A protein has these predicted regions:
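Conserved beta-strand segments of alpha/beta enzyme cores
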Residues: 26, 48, 91, 116, ...
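Short, basic/aromatic-enriched C-terminal tail that caps enzymatic domains
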Residues: 268-294
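Rossmann-like NAD(P)-binding element
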Residues: 47-86, 90-93, 98
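Rossmann-fold dinucleotide-binding core
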Residues: 4, 98-177
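Helical "substrate-binding/catalytic lid" subdomain
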Residues: 168-271
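NAD(P)+-binding Rossmann beta1-loop-alpha1 motif at the extreme N-terminus of oxidoreductases
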Residues: 1-58
């Protein structure tokens, strides 16, 4: 049985925590800065809610960071502040969609206080952790974290310099985030020509694998598009670091920027056709919006 502090219990964090609970581990979280809804979700999931971040860390051997990409560095700094000087700090596992440069920066922050960091990428469904997921880990304690998840999911180790798991995550995300953005462009063009239903039907007939992915992922975007935009920014940071232009990624991010700015209902349970119709009707990708998104 391992004590694990979960930072924080959002959609994927809750799924990871529940899966670890089912394997007999103890999951802690500190929710002093979170909403009542988050606290209820954590308590209903069986997590132990601590009064402070420091208390949760003090009870744990492993800390899992699952936050929006833009918060990952600050979470690492906050963790480092709490464990500095401790004789034995938890292993810090960054499970966020961040670029390898950001992962390396986090690795340095954690190493500077004498703790160990693991770079981790989680692939597959975000609302449950099981056989459909794959986890990639990288770092000096990668095997320890691989053992933690081995009975839950398929685990792979990315060898080489720290940030290898994030490199795999970002490379995969170029496709998994850019494909929905490209599909929106395709469907807006077909909708403007009065052929949306036929085009989508043909896609389903001729490219069922792609259509299955689009049908599963794109309807979640009104709720999660801000995070997807952050992820695309992280990819652009990485591509620039590699000396690549990132032109396709940049263009896909612009489409997602527009979708975010359209502010389609995040609470509605969208089906694919309804979402595509709304994007077309709102002129989300209209030419007159050119220049409105940097």
């Amino acid at each position: 049985m391992t004590g694990i502090v979960l930072i924080s219990p959002g959609l994927m964090g809750t799924a990871v925590g529940r899966a670890l609970l089912c394997r007999g581990h103890v999951v802690y979280c500190a929710l002093s800065r979170r909403s009542d809804a988050t606290r209820r979700r954590a308590e209903q999931s069986g997590f132990i809610c601590c009064d402070s971040f420091g208390e949760a860390i003090g009870k744990s051997e492993i800390a899992l960071s699952l936050v929006p990409p833009g918060q990952a560095l600050n979470v690492a700094r906050r963790f480092a502040d709490h464990v500095a000087g401790l004789p034995a700090a938890p292993i810090f596992v960054d499970c966020n969609s961040i670029s390898p440069p950001t992962a390396r920066a986090i690795g340095r922050i954690i190493a500077d206080v004498g703790a160990a960091a693991v770079d981790c990428g989680i692939f597959g469904p975000a609302d449950k952790i099981g056989p459909e997921n794959v986890i990639v880990v990288n770092g000096s304690e990668a095997r320890a974290i691989a053992s933690l998840f081995a009975d839950l999911v398929e685990v792979k180790i990315a060898h080489g310099a720290f940030g290898g798991a994030s490199a795999v995550k970002m490379a995969m995300s170029i496709i998994t985030k850019a494909l929905p953005a490209l599909f929106l462009e395709s469907t807006c063009a077909s909708a403007a020509s009065g052929q949306l239903d036929l085009m989508v039907g043909l896609f389903d007939r001729l490219y069922p694998g792609i259509m299955s992915f689009i049908s599963r992922s794109l309807p979640t975007y009104p709720r999660h598009v801000a995070r997807r935009v952050d992820e695309m920014h992280e990819i652009e940071i990485w591509l620039r670091d590699l000396g690549l232009s990132g032109a396709m990624t940049h263009s896909a991010r612009q489409n997602l920027d527009r979708l975010r700015d359209a502010e389609l209902s995040a609470e509605r349970k969208w089906d694919l056709i309804a979402l595509l119709d709304a994007v077309a009707r709102h002129g989300v990708l209209a030419a007159e919006r050119e220049g409105a998104v940097a």
